[in-house]
């Protein structure tokens, strides 16, 4: 058949169709056996080397994958970079703990009051601590009623109430009740208004740079 002649006779068309059907039947009748199904022996003669090279590349890729999955199938983990942990000093700790009020505050300015429990009937056992804490709370509540304190808000500059301007920080008075034996002490100190409120007694430093160094409450602390 002349390759430049694009017309086909009925016999030539039948031969082309028969060849195509035979090729399809050949591949569909072959049993799939893993990587061997794409080897050179399964490709009929006359097919270009492009298919052969593609099949070999596919076989090699599948073989490498199987080798890498041996031993449970888990991929090896990449080593993670070690994180250097720098020990924190007092300057980087956000809240400095305040010791037991009965043992002093270690140069932390504060005011301590020893409660007079003479004439009080103290229970024994585990309920004693609850009773002592109750006495300390009653002392604080009575103090606020009988001796109202000055406004704790104090700034380093005169307050300006112009709209849109910040009035600055202030101090917040905090209290802690502690007891040893039959002795109860109430400790009070000031924290800057920008500091967090915590259940534990802690002394904080100003972080907003607007709170005053001292106020009318803490200026008499020792």
From Swiss-Prot:
Gene3D superfamilies cross-referenced by the UniProt entry: 4.10.80.340
Function of the protein: Plays an essential role in the inhibition of host immune response. Prevents the establishment of cellular antiviral state by blocking interferon-alpha/beta (IFN-alpha/beta) production and signaling pathway. Interacts with host IFIH1/MDA5 and DHX58/LGP2 to inhibit the transduction pathway involved in the activation of IFN-beta promoter, thus protecting the virus against cell antiviral state. Efficiently blocks type I IFN signaling following infection by behaving as a substrate receptor for CUL4-DDB1 E3 ligase complex and targeting host STAT1 for proteasomal degradation.
The name this protein goes by in its record: Non-structural protein V
MF terms in GO: metal ion binding; RNA binding; ubiquitin-like ligase-substrate adaptor activity
Protein localization: Host cytoplasm
Gene Ontology cellular component annotations, sorted alphabetically: host cell cytoplasm
GO process terms (BP): symbiont-mediated suppression of host cytoplasmic pattern recognition receptor signaling pathway via inhibition of MDA-5 activity; symbiont-mediated suppression of host JAK-STAT cascade via inhibition of STAT1 activity; symbiont-mediated suppression of host JAK-STAT cascade via inhibition of STAT2 activity; symbiont-mediated suppression of host type I interferon-mediated signaling pathway
Pfam families found in the cross-reference section: Soyouz_module (PF14313), zf-Paramyx-P (PF13008)
Binding site for Zn(2+) 1: 171, 190, 215, 218
Family: Belongs to the paramyxoviruses V protein family.
Main location: host cell
Binding site for Zn(2+) 2: 194, 206, 208, 211
Name of the gene this protein is made from: P/V
Keyword terms of this UniProt record: Host cytoplasm, Host-virus interaction, Inhibition of host innate immune response by virus, Inhibition of host interferon signaling pathway by virus, Inhibition of host MDA5 by virus, Inhibition of host RLR pathway by virus, Inhibition of host STAT1 by virus, Interferon antiviral system evasion, Metal-binding, RNA-binding, Ubl conjugation pathway, Viral immunoevasion, Zinc
Description of how the protein assembles with itself and partners: Interacts with host DDB1, STAT2 and IFIH1/MDA5. Interacts with host RIGI regulatory protein (via CARDs domain) and host TRIM25 (via SPRY domain); these interactions prevent TRIM25-mediated ubiquitination of RIG-I and disrupts downstream RIG-I signaling.
Stretches for region Disordered: 61-107
Species name: Parainfluenza virus 5 (strain W3) (PIV5)
């Amino acid at each position: 058949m002349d390759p430049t002649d694009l017309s086909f006779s009925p016999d030539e068309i039948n031969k082309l169709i028969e060849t195509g059907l035979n090729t399809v039947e050949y591949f569909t009748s072959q049993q799939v056996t893993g990587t061997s199904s794409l080897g050179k022996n399964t490709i009929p003669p006359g097919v270009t080397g492009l298919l052969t090279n593609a099949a070999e590349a596919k076989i090699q890729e599948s073989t490498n994958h199987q080798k890498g999955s041996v031993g449970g199938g888990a991929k090896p983990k990449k080593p993670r970079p070690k994180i250097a942990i720098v020990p924190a000093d007092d300057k980087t700790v956000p809240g400095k703990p305040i010791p037991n009020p009965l043992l002093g505050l270690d140069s932390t300015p504060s005011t301590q009051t020893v409660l007079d429990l003479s004439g009080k009937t103290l229970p024994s056992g585990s309920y004693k601590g609850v009773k002592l804490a109750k006495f300390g709370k009653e002392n604080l509540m009575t103090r606020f009623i009988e001796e109202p304190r000055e406004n704790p808000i104090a700034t380093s500059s005169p307050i300006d109430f112009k709209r849109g301007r910040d009035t600055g920080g202030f101090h917040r008075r905090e209290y802690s009740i502690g007891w040893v034996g039959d002795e109860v002490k109430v400790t009070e100190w000031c924290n800057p208004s920008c500091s967090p409120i915590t259940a534990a007694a802690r002394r904080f430093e100003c972080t907003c740079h607007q709170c005053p160094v001292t106020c009318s409450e803490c200026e008499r602390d020792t």
